[in-house]
Amino acid sequence: MAFLTKKKKFKFQTSFNLEELTAVPFVNGVLFCKVRLLDGGDFVSQSSREEVQENCVRWKKKFNFVCKMSANSATGVLDPCVCRVSVRKELKGGKTYSKLGFADLNLAEFAGSGSAARCCLLEGYDTRNTRQDNSILKVNIGMSLLSGDPCFKTPLSTVKTVSPPGQDSSLQMTCKGEGTVRSAGGTVRQNRSRQAMLSSGVFDETEQNLSSPEETPHSGHSRNSSQASQQSKISGHSSEHSRCSSMSDLTHRRNTSTSSSVSGGLSLTAEGTEPERDVKPEKPPRPIRPPLHPDRHSRRKKDSVESQPTWVDDTRIDADDIVEKIMQSQDFSDVSNNEDSHLRLFVSRDGSTTLSGIQLANRISAGVFEPVMIEIR
């Protein structure tokens, strides 16, 4: 039975891409990383030294190395193979450095998955005396099998999913859209895919329309606003209820199409939906459009789309109307050919000259200026 305790050996060609470090708590500085295999090899390498720009450092450095792994022969699960990425900052012009933090990555989780990206928070070396930063390191890891049994299992992922505050912990990635879940006590609970929409009040109206189990005449009836109308699998479902549900969908356009599914041979009659119709608020009336200009349609194209009045055309000022108003406000009937209305040249006795029209000529006293006539030859 010694062969059962012997572990399987594997070799993987690893492509480790060091992408970037975001949310760096420094405005300037030079950072670099040291990549080292803690298990399955002796690979050690450093990245290039890059400056901090807009609280972000981008290395775009690729490391290629071979790592060795082992797996239990009974279960086939790969043993951990940790690769540590240490982020460091240059000090004294590059002579020394300080360690900002590190991130440990289990390469066994990436075995056989092709290329996968991972973002992880930096862990501090001295968490007692230094404050931990929220810098996020992004890497891209790809692994391919070189030797060993191709049948193996990867360990469970250590990635932790953090849900926003106030979000229901029962919501998982498999829950899609909206739905109603019946608990053991018989109460109906509605799932929401996004808790943020509830806080903003988007679904306030739909929550009011959902009736509680005490208000509904039959406890086996539940409504789902995200699905289409379903046909009952029970032979006792009447056609009158289907006509009633379709009429309620047409009259209330703000709500999505509803459906009803009956369990246990119970059916919902038309009288049960009447109180729900009274609770729903009516759609507010649309504001009245301003009257159109009588000459507006003559200037438009006669296409089928542009011939219909739109809100943009009603609120837009027509340039032709402004030109017509300006032309009508001007008086072009008084056309005078009198020479006194033009500019006149006056020369005084001391040789000074002045230009003026008829208004200044009337105010000038006689003898001070003499008019000069210039003839065209």
Curated annotation (Swiss-Prot):
InterPro entries xrefs: EEIG1/2-like, NT-C2
Bias kind Polar residues: ranges: 160-173, 188-198, 222-234
One of the Pfam families matching this protein, by short name: NT-C2
Biased composition range(s): Basic and acidic residues: 274-285
Keywords on record: Cytoplasm, Nucleus
Compartments it resides in: Nucleus; Cytoplasm
Residue span(s) of domain C2 NT-type: 2-145
Assigned protein family: Belongs to the EEIG family.
Protein name per its UniProtKB record: Early estrogen-induced gene 1 protein
Biological source species: Xenopus laevis
Gene that produces this protein: eeig1
